[in-house]
Amino acid sequence: MTVLYLLEPESPGGEWAPFAGVRPIAELRAGIWRIRERWEAAAGVDVKVTWGSHAAGFSEGDEPPLRSLEPLDGPALVGASWFAPTGVPISPGHGVRRLVHRDETVGWVVPEGERWSGPHEKGPALEIDGLRLRGTFDLLTALDHLLSDDCADFLAAPGDPVPQGSLVLGDPANLVCLGATVEPGVVFDVRNGAVVVDQGSEIRNGSRLEGPAYVGPGTRVLGGFIRGSVFGPECRVRGEISSSVFFGFANKSHEGFIGHSVVGHWVNLGAGTTTSNLKNTYGQVRLEVDGERIETGRLNVGTLFGDHAKTAIGTMLPTGTVVSAGANVFGSVTPPKYIPPFAWGCTGGERMTEDGFLRIAERVMTRRAVAFSPERREALRRTFQRTIAR
């Protein structure tokens, strides 16, 4: 049986901020699904190992082990974690040694009896469909290209009837509720794409959801206008949210605009936090990451929030801001476009201590009934030490 592996970028740079060194690229969401899950769907098997050392020690409990690259024996398939397959089954024929997308190698086929020692450009290739990701900002591009089809894939699932008292604009068949609680007065606009409300989620009165959109298990939409966005598990959201992806366990329980943004795990956004997602010049957005300038090629980029980042009440974030892992954004000044890992405030260069970060993380996770196990503590401790040293 063919074994599936994923290969991380050897040394991801600023283009993958604020997640380089924090979590594997394979565990980021491209559309509804994590990149790893997309490879698993395309290959028809689960990933055995993710090869990569930049996020050594990462652990959340449901991901494959993360190890340094070493030779492997076939039969195997190795996928690049910077590529998101569309889910079309991959069936390499006899003699195929590489998977390519627009002339770029994004995977390798290792037949039985052969050994693979690392990336190469040798042998016949099979063209596959998907999206090449240049950095974290291209998770927004994934929403543009993948979300509509991701939501449409749910249409065949046996869902609940249209919730009583809700208003559906468009064909009700494009609303999929899978064991969710929906209060009367919710508006679902499915004229431009399906809306999927997954198991155990809750949509409260005063919410309007415009498809394509996905609300993950256990997530609560507390009110406001949601369009073109993805929410992973156990998020709390309110206000206006447009073309954004929330990985999971994030908290935005108050008013404020979040547009064209990526929100990592365990992020907490204070009341009124607002992102700018468009320059006054209507020019392409450039990121600034620790002195490095990165061209996104995109007109709309809001803020990229790293895991465990937090903002104070009324925080106003410029277009193309990067808030690194564990950073606490507060103060009377406009935040800079780059906020380093575990920053304490926007000025003065102060940083959180390791003990302080772990103490807050334990409080936050306990409130969501997530066990702060010794293994999780150790994983976060290693993340702190690794990112501070970068």
Feature locations, PLM:
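Glycine-rich hexapeptide-repeat left-handed beta-helix
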Residues: 12, 27, 223-225, 232-390
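Active-site-proximal helix/loop capping residues that flank conserved catalytic or ligand/cofactor
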Residues: 34-37, 137, 178, 217, ...
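Generic, low-specificity signal for short hydrophobic/alpha-helical stretches with a mild N-terminal bias
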Residues: 18-21, 121-125, 162, 183, ...
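Terminal amphipathic alpha-helical/low-complexity segments used for targeting or macromolecular assembly
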Residues: 1-173, 332-337, 341-390
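Extended beta-solenoid/beta-helix repeat architectures
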Residues: 158-264, 279-280, 289, 304, ...
